């Protein structure tokens, strides 16, 4: 069956989340008068990301709400477990202002989307919330390029669960065999998509993250994607997919 649609991850696939997070946190800590509290900017960022990974995993497992994981990240990072929800929300909103000011697409995103626009339908599957990612896509000028936006917070299940990928395919009205998925995480994105029956592309921008899961297609930039999809033997051409 030919591939008719491409589903996309957003953070660190289309949008440079890592860069925006680092820049936003540094500016936020400076404005909050916390610049010296954590030693270097790198040390502060490491603590922030440790808290983010811990509580995002809890959200993905259904242990806390989307807003709850934000509040817990703030409490852990500040080492203030008694911080109220309103206080944690306010701190996080101030951080968001700096983080959003640093939002940017990777330079290969628009050329790839333009090259694929006439041949494939497009959608998004994200482990975030619809409100968060809709706002992000609109800010970045991408929202109208995607027919569907499916997010874990509303869906009640997150990647790499097969059900998340199947729900996104259902939203497109296509079977998994006719859908490709592109994401930067080898397990959450690529393995999850593969296990759900989609054609999985792991976007390894650094090119040095070690071997990926079997049965997925590893690319180091989105400029590779149009040629690889067009070269799939299911279209009767020599396969360019490895």
Label the model's feature ranges.
Residues 2-107:
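N-terminal helical cap/lid subdomain that shapes the substrate entry/recognition surface
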Residues 119-120, 197:
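Glycine-centered short loops/turns at secondary-structure junctions
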């Amino acid at each position: 069956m030919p591939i008719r649609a491409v589903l996309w991850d957003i953070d660190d696939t289309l949008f440079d989340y890592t860069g925006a997070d680092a820049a936003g946190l540094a500016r936020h800590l400076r404005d909050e008068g916390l610049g010296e509290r954590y030693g270097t900017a790198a040390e502060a960022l490491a603590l922030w990301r440790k808290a983010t990974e811990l509580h995002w995993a809890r959200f993905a497992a259904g242990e806390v709400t989307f807003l709850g994981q934000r509040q817990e990240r703030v409490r852990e990072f500040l080492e203030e477990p008694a911080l109220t929800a309103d206080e944690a929300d306010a701190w996080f909103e101030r951080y968001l202002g700096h983080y959003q000011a640093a939002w940017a697409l990777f330079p290969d995103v628009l050329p790839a989307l333009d090259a694929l626009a006439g041949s494939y339908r497009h959608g998004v599957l994200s482990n975030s919330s619809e409100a968060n990612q809709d706002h992000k896509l609109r800010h970045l000028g991408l929202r109208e390029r995607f027919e569907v936006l499916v997010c874990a917070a509303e869906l009640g299940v997150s990647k790499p669960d097969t059900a998340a990928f199947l729900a996104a395919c259902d939203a497109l009205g296509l079977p998994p065999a006719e859908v490709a998925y592109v994401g930067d995480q080898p397990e959450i994105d690529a393995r999850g998509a593969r296990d759900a029956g989609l054609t999985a592309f792991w976007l390894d921008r650094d090119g040095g993250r070690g071997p990926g899961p079997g049965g997925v297609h590893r690319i180091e930039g989105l400029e590779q994607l149009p040629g690889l999809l067009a070269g799939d033997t299911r279209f009767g051409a020599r396969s360019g997919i490895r």
